[in-house]
Curated annotation (Swiss-Prot):
The modification Phosphothreonine is found at T296. This is Putative box C/D snoRNA protein SPCC613.07. GO terms for molecular function: zinc ion binding. It comes from Schizosaccharomyces pombe (strain 972 / ATCC 24843). The modification Phosphoserine is found at S294. Belongs to the BCD1 family.
Length: 345
Protein backbone atom coordinates (compact mmCIF):
# COMPACT_ATOMS: atom_id res chain seq x y z
CA UNK A 1 0.00 0.00 0.00
CA UNK A 2 2.82 2.38 0.89
CA UNK A 3 4.49 1.47 -2.38
CA UNK A 4 1.41 2.55 -4.35
CA UNK A 5 1.01 5.73 -2.31
CA UNK A 6 4.64 6.96 -2.36
CA UNK A 7 5.96 5.29 -5.48
CA UNK A 8 9.57 4.58 -6.42
CA UNK A 9 12.54 6.37 -4.87
CA UNK A 10 13.30 9.53 -6.85
CA UNK A 11 17.07 9.18 -6.37
CA UNK A 12 17.98 5.56 -7.02
CA UNK A 13 14.87 4.68 -9.08
CA UNK A 14 15.04 1.11 -7.76
CA UNK A 15 13.52 0.67 -4.33
CA UNK A 16 10.14 1.65 -3.02
CA UNK A 17 10.14 5.02 -1.30
CA UNK A 18 9.48 5.29 2.43
CA UNK A 19 10.15 8.96 3.19
CA UNK A 20 9.12 12.31 1.75
CA UNK A 21 11.11 15.54 1.70
CA UNK A 22 9.23 18.32 3.54
CA UNK A 23 10.76 20.94 1.28
CA UNK A 24 10.34 19.70 -2.28
CA UNK A 25 8.04 16.68 -1.71
CA UNK A 26 10.55 14.22 -3.23
CA UNK A 27 10.44 10.50 -2.27
CA UNK A 28 13.33 8.47 -0.85
CA UNK A 29 13.95 4.95 0.22
CA UNK A 30 16.83 5.51 2.67
CA UNK A 31 19.06 8.12 4.26
CA UNK A 32 21.78 7.78 1.62
CA UNK A 33 19.33 8.70 -1.13
CA UNK A 34 18.13 11.66 0.91
CA UNK A 35 21.68 12.97 1.36
CA UNK A 36 22.41 12.44 -2.32
CA UNK A 37 19.27 14.38 -3.19
CA UNK A 38 20.36 17.30 -0.97
CA UNK A 39 23.83 17.29 -2.51
CA UNK A 40 22.55 17.32 -6.09
CA UNK A 41 19.64 19.73 -5.74
CA UNK A 42 20.98 21.91 -2.87
CA UNK A 43 17.77 21.25 -1.01
CA UNK A 44 17.72 22.13 2.70
CA UNK A 45 15.18 19.44 3.58
CA UNK A 46 13.27 21.83 5.86
CA UNK A 47 9.65 22.78 5.42
CA UNK A 48 8.97 26.24 4.02
CA UNK A 49 6.41 27.86 6.34
CA UNK A 50 5.56 30.52 3.73
CA UNK A 51 4.43 28.04 1.06
CA UNK A 52 0.92 28.60 -0.23
CA UNK A 53 -1.59 26.05 1.08
CA UNK A 54 -5.02 25.69 -0.56
CA UNK A 55 -8.09 26.07 1.61
CA UNK A 56 -9.05 22.43 1.08
CA UNK A 57 -5.75 21.25 2.58
CA UNK A 58 -5.57 23.84 5.34
CA UNK A 59 -6.83 21.49 8.06
CA UNK A 60 -4.16 18.92 7.29
CA UNK A 61 -1.41 21.55 7.73
CA UNK A 62 -2.42 22.62 11.23
CA UNK A 63 -0.10 20.06 12.75
CA UNK A 64 2.73 21.32 10.60
CA UNK A 65 2.08 24.91 11.68
CA UNK A 66 1.95 23.86 15.31
CA UNK A 67 5.20 21.96 14.94
CA UNK A 68 6.78 24.97 13.25
CA UNK A 69 5.79 27.33 16.08
CA UNK A 70 6.93 24.82 18.69
CA UNK A 71 10.24 24.45 16.88
CA UNK A 72 10.72 28.22 16.84
CA UNK A 73 10.03 28.37 20.57
CA UNK A 74 12.46 25.56 21.28
CA UNK A 75 15.09 27.24 19.11
CA UNK A 76 14.75 30.51 21.00
CA UNK A 77 14.97 28.78 24.36
CA UNK A 78 17.96 26.75 23.23
CA UNK A 79 19.72 29.85 21.96
CA UNK A 80 19.07 31.74 25.18
CA UNK A 81 20.10 28.89 27.46
CA UNK A 82 23.01 27.81 25.30
CA UNK A 83 24.42 31.30 24.89
CA UNK A 84 23.98 31.88 28.61
CA UNK A 85 25.89 28.74 29.43
CA UNK A 86 28.64 29.53 26.94
CA UNK A 87 28.90 33.09 28.18
CA UNK A 88 29.04 31.85 31.76
CA UNK A 89 31.86 29.47 30.90
CA UNK A 90 33.70 32.08 28.86
CA UNK A 91 33.14 34.79 31.45
CA UNK A 92 34.40 32.49 34.18
CA UNK A 93 37.63 31.90 32.27
CA UNK A 94 38.01 35.59 31.53
CA UNK A 95 37.37 36.45 35.17
CA UNK A 96 40.07 34.04 36.29
CA UNK A 97 42.44 35.53 33.72
CA UNK A 98 41.62 39.04 34.92
CA UNK A 99 42.27 38.12 38.55
CA UNK A 100 45.63 36.56 37.74
CA UNK A 101 46.63 39.62 35.69
CA UNK A 102 45.58 42.00 38.45
CA UNK A 103 47.71 40.03 40.89
CA UNK A 104 50.61 40.57 38.49
CA UNK A 105 49.96 44.34 38.51
CA UNK A 106 48.22 44.58 35.10
CA UNK A 107 44.91 46.43 35.00
CA UNK A 108 42.83 44.91 32.18
CA UNK A 109 39.35 45.77 30.96
CA UNK A 110 37.52 43.52 28.52
CA UNK A 111 35.66 44.93 25.53
CA UNK A 112 31.98 44.17 24.74
CA UNK A 113 31.27 41.11 22.56
CA UNK A 114 30.61 43.24 19.46
CA UNK A 115 34.06 44.85 19.60
CA UNK A 116 36.59 43.87 16.94
CA UNK A 117 39.37 43.39 19.47
CA UNK A 118 37.16 41.03 21.45
CA UNK A 119 36.64 38.82 18.40
CA UNK A 120 40.35 38.80 17.54
CA UNK A 121 41.64 38.32 21.07
CA UNK A 122 43.19 34.91 21.79
CA UNK A 123 44.84 35.66 25.11
CA UNK A 124 44.65 32.54 27.28
CA UNK A 125 46.36 30.58 30.01
CA UNK A 126 48.44 27.69 28.69
CA UNK A 127 48.20 24.74 31.08
CA UNK A 128 51.24 22.98 29.62
CA UNK A 129 53.69 25.83 30.06
CA UNK A 130 51.79 27.44 32.97
CA UNK A 131 52.13 30.79 31.24
CA UNK A 132 49.76 33.39 29.84
CA UNK A 133 50.03 33.69 26.07
CA UNK A 134 49.11 37.14 24.87
CA UNK A 135 47.60 38.60 21.76
CA UNK A 136 49.38 41.90 21.04
CA UNK A 137 48.27 44.81 18.89
CA UNK A 138 51.27 46.47 17.26
CA UNK A 139 50.83 50.09 16.16
CA UNK A 140 53.73 51.02 13.87
CA UNK A 141 54.08 54.79 13.47
CA UNK A 142 55.73 56.24 10.42
CA UNK A 143 59.14 57.80 10.84
CA UNK A 144 58.04 61.14 9.36
CA UNK A 145 57.69 63.83 12.00
CA UNK A 146 54.90 65.60 10.12
CA UNK A 147 52.36 62.99 11.12
CA UNK A 148 50.26 63.76 14.15
CA UNK A 149 51.09 61.40 16.99
CA UNK A 150 47.49 61.47 18.20
CA UNK A 151 46.43 59.41 15.18
CA UNK A 152 45.82 55.72 15.69
CA UNK A 153 47.81 54.80 12.56
CA UNK A 154 45.28 52.11 11.73
CA UNK A 155 46.92 51.46 8.36
CA UNK A 156 50.03 50.20 10.19
CA UNK A 157 48.30 48.14 12.85
CA UNK A 158 48.49 44.37 13.18
CA UNK A 159 47.43 41.88 15.87
CA UNK A 160 49.61 38.84 16.55
CA UNK A 161 48.95 35.91 18.87
CA UNK A 162 50.52 33.33 21.21
CA UNK A 163 53.26 35.41 22.80
CA UNK A 164 54.46 33.99 26.15
CA UNK A 165 54.53 36.45 29.02
CA UNK A 166 58.09 35.45 29.98
CA UNK A 167 59.61 36.23 26.57
CA UNK A 168 61.44 39.57 26.08
CA UNK A 169 59.61 42.13 23.99
CA UNK A 170 62.55 42.72 21.66
CA UNK A 171 62.81 39.01 20.91
CA UNK A 172 59.10 38.81 20.15
CA UNK A 173 59.32 41.71 17.71
CA UNK A 174 62.42 40.39 15.92
CA UNK A 175 60.84 36.97 15.54
CA UNK A 176 57.69 38.50 14.07
CA UNK A 177 59.64 40.56 11.55
CA UNK A 178 61.61 37.51 10.44
CA UNK A 179 58.81 34.94 10.33
CA UNK A 180 55.59 36.88 9.78
CA UNK A 181 55.32 38.25 6.25
CA UNK A 182 52.44 40.56 7.14
CA UNK A 183 54.41 42.05 10.01
CA UNK A 184 57.42 42.51 7.74
CA UNK A 185 55.32 44.37 5.18
CA UNK A 186 53.85 46.61 7.88
CA UNK A 187 57.32 47.43 9.19
CA UNK A 188 58.57 48.34 5.72
CA UNK A 189 55.42 50.38 5.12
CA UNK A 190 56.09 52.38 8.28
CA UNK A 191 59.69 53.10 7.11
CA UNK A 192 61.18 51.37 10.13
CA UNK A 193 64.52 49.97 9.00
CA UNK A 194 66.78 49.15 11.95
CA UNK A 195 65.16 47.36 14.90
CA UNK A 196 67.85 48.74 17.21
CA UNK A 197 66.75 52.32 16.55
CA UNK A 198 63.17 51.73 17.69
CA UNK A 199 61.46 52.79 20.87
CA UNK A 200 58.47 50.95 22.32
CA UNK A 201 55.69 52.87 24.05
CA UNK A 202 52.37 52.28 25.79
CA UNK A 203 49.74 54.99 26.09
CA UNK A 204 49.58 56.30 29.64
CA UNK A 205 47.03 59.12 29.56
CA UNK A 206 45.85 62.05 27.46
CA UNK A 207 46.65 65.69 28.08
CA UNK A 208 44.61 68.59 26.77
CA UNK A 209 47.65 70.59 25.74
CA UNK A 210 50.03 67.86 24.50
CA UNK A 211 47.72 65.03 23.42
CA UNK A 212 48.66 61.47 24.31
CA UNK A 213 51.33 60.88 26.94
CA UNK A 214 53.27 57.64 26.43
CA UNK A 215 55.03 55.36 28.86
CA UNK A 216 58.39 54.14 27.59
CA UNK A 217 59.07 50.43 28.08
CA UNK A 218 62.37 48.62 27.99
CA UNK A 219 62.43 46.07 25.13
CA UNK A 220 64.89 43.81 26.96
CA UNK A 221 62.35 43.16 29.72
CA UNK A 222 59.79 40.37 29.59
CA UNK A 223 56.32 41.02 28.29
CA UNK A 224 54.71 40.74 31.73
CA UNK A 225 57.16 43.25 33.25
CA UNK A 226 56.56 45.65 30.34
CA UNK A 227 52.81 45.55 30.96
CA UNK A 228 53.07 45.89 34.74
CA UNK A 229 51.45 49.04 36.21
CA UNK A 230 49.68 49.77 32.93
CA UNK A 231 46.11 49.73 31.62
CA UNK A 232 45.14 47.16 28.95
CA UNK A 233 41.91 47.33 26.96
CA UNK A 234 41.21 43.75 25.80
CA UNK A 235 44.68 43.36 24.23
CA UNK A 236 47.86 45.34 24.93
CA UNK A 237 48.61 47.98 22.30
CA UNK A 238 52.33 48.59 21.85
CA UNK A 239 53.32 51.65 19.82
CA UNK A 240 56.57 51.47 17.90
CA UNK A 241 58.41 54.70 17.02
CA UNK A 242 61.82 55.39 15.57
CA UNK A 243 64.44 56.87 17.88
CA UNK A 244 64.31 60.20 16.02
CA UNK A 245 60.57 60.65 16.53
CA UNK A 246 59.69 63.11 19.28
CA UNK A 247 57.12 61.62 21.62
CA UNK A 248 55.62 63.12 24.77
CA UNK A 249 56.65 60.71 27.51
CA UNK A 250 55.76 60.70 31.19
CA UNK A 251 59.19 61.99 32.25
CA UNK A 252 59.10 64.97 29.89
CA UNK A 253 55.50 65.73 30.82
CA UNK A 254 56.25 65.67 34.56
CA UNK A 255 59.28 67.91 34.06
CA UNK A 256 57.28 70.51 32.14
CA UNK A 257 54.41 70.36 34.62
CA UNK A 258 56.80 70.86 37.57
CA UNK A 259 58.33 73.90 35.86
CA UNK A 260 54.88 75.35 35.29
CA UNK A 261 53.95 74.72 38.91
CA UNK A 262 57.15 76.48 40.08
CA UNK A 263 56.36 79.50 37.92
CA UNK A 264 52.79 79.61 39.15
CA UNK A 265 53.89 79.27 42.80
CA UNK A 266 56.43 82.10 42.44
CA UNK A 267 53.85 84.37 40.84
CA UNK A 268 51.29 83.48 43.50
CA UNK A 269 53.82 84.24 46.26
CA UNK A 270 54.48 87.68 44.75
CA UNK A 271 50.78 88.35 44.57
CA UNK A 272 50.25 87.19 48.14
CA UNK A 273 53.09 89.46 49.40
CA UNK A 274 51.58 92.47 47.69
CA UNK A 275 48.15 91.61 49.04
CA UNK A 276 49.53 91.26 52.57
CA UNK A 277 51.26 94.65 52.39
CA UNK A 278 48.11 96.32 51.10
CA UNK A 279 46.00 94.65 53.78
CA UNK A 280 48.41 95.86 56.50
CA UNK A 281 48.10 99.43 55.24
CA UNK A 282 44.32 99.20 55.26
CA UNK A 283 44.29 97.85 58.82
CA UNK A 284 46.50 100.70 60.03
CA UNK A 285 44.22 103.29 58.42
CA UNK A 286 41.13 101.72 59.98
CA UNK A 287 42.70 101.64 63.45
CA UNK A 288 43.63 105.32 63.19
CA UNK A 289 40.08 106.23 62.17
CA UNK A 290 38.65 104.28 65.11
CA UNK A 291 40.96 106.02 67.57
CA UNK A 292 40.01 109.42 66.20
CA UNK A 293 36.26 108.79 66.25
CA UNK A 294 35.91 106.73 69.46
CA UNK A 295 34.75 109.54 71.96
CA UNK A 296 32.10 110.97 69.69
CA UNK A 297 30.82 107.52 68.83
CA UNK A 298 30.41 106.69 72.54
CA UNK A 299 28.46 109.92 73.16
CA UNK A 300 26.21 109.28 70.19
CA UNK A 301 25.44 105.70 71.22
CA UNK A 302 24.67 106.69 74.84
CA UNK A 303 22.29 109.43 73.70
CA UNK A 304 20.55 107.04 71.34
CA UNK A 305 20.07 104.46 74.12
CA UNK A 306 18.61 107.03 76.50
CA UNK A 307 16.16 108.29 73.88
CA UNK A 308 15.01 104.74 73.14
CA UNK A 309 14.52 104.09 76.87
CA UNK A 310 12.36 107.18 77.38
CA UNK A 311 10.30 106.34 74.29
CA UNK A 312 9.56 102.83 75.61
CA UNK A 313 8.44 104.25 78.96
CA UNK A 314 6.06 106.68 77.24
CA UNK A 315 4.54 103.83 75.26
CA UNK A 316 3.90 101.82 78.41
CA UNK A 317 2.19 104.81 80.09
CA UNK A 318 -0.09 105.27 77.12
CA UNK A 319 -1.17 101.61 77.25
CA UNK A 320 -2.46 101.93 80.81
CA UNK A 321 -5.59 103.77 81.94
CA UNK A 322 -5.80 106.13 84.87
CA UNK A 323 -7.20 103.33 87.13
CA UNK A 324 -4.23 101.06 86.35
CA UNK A 325 -6.01 98.77 83.85
CA UNK A 326 -4.51 98.25 80.46
CA UNK A 327 -5.94 100.11 77.49
CA UNK A 328 -8.46 98.26 75.30
CA UNK A 329 -7.42 97.36 71.86
CA UNK A 330 -9.50 98.34 68.87
CA UNK A 331 -11.69 95.50 67.57
CA UNK A 332 -13.98 95.25 64.57
CA UNK A 333 -17.33 97.03 65.11
CA UNK A 334 -19.35 93.82 65.00
CA UNK A 335 -17.57 91.94 67.81
CA UNK A 336 -15.83 94.74 69.70
CA UNK A 337 -18.81 96.02 71.68
CA UNK A 338 -19.89 92.55 72.77
CA UNK A 339 -16.51 91.49 74.12
CA UNK A 340 -16.02 94.85 75.80
CA UNK A 341 -19.32 94.45 77.65
CA UNK A 342 -18.30 91.02 78.86
CA UNK A 343 -15.17 92.54 80.33
CA UNK A 344 -12.79 90.30 78.44
CA UNK A 345 -10.92 93.16 76.89
Amino acid sequence: MSENRLGICSTCQKNASKYRCPRCDSRFCCLECNLEHKRLTKCSGERDPATFVPKSKLVNHLNSDFNFLSGVERLINRKENGSHQVSNRAERNRLQLKRSLERAGINIKFAPPSNKKRRLNRTHYDKKSHLIKWSIEWCLHESSTSKDLTDEASENTIITHSHPESEPLEKIFRKLVEENSEMNSQVSKANIHAPDDMQFMIKSRKSRSKGFIYKKIEPSNSLSSCLRNSFVFEVPTIHVFTSTTQVHTESSYETSSSEQSDDSSSSSSCISDSEESSSDDELNELSNEKKANSPTQNVDTSSKLSSVKFQNEDDEDRRKNSDGSEASYSLPPLFGSYFQKQGQY
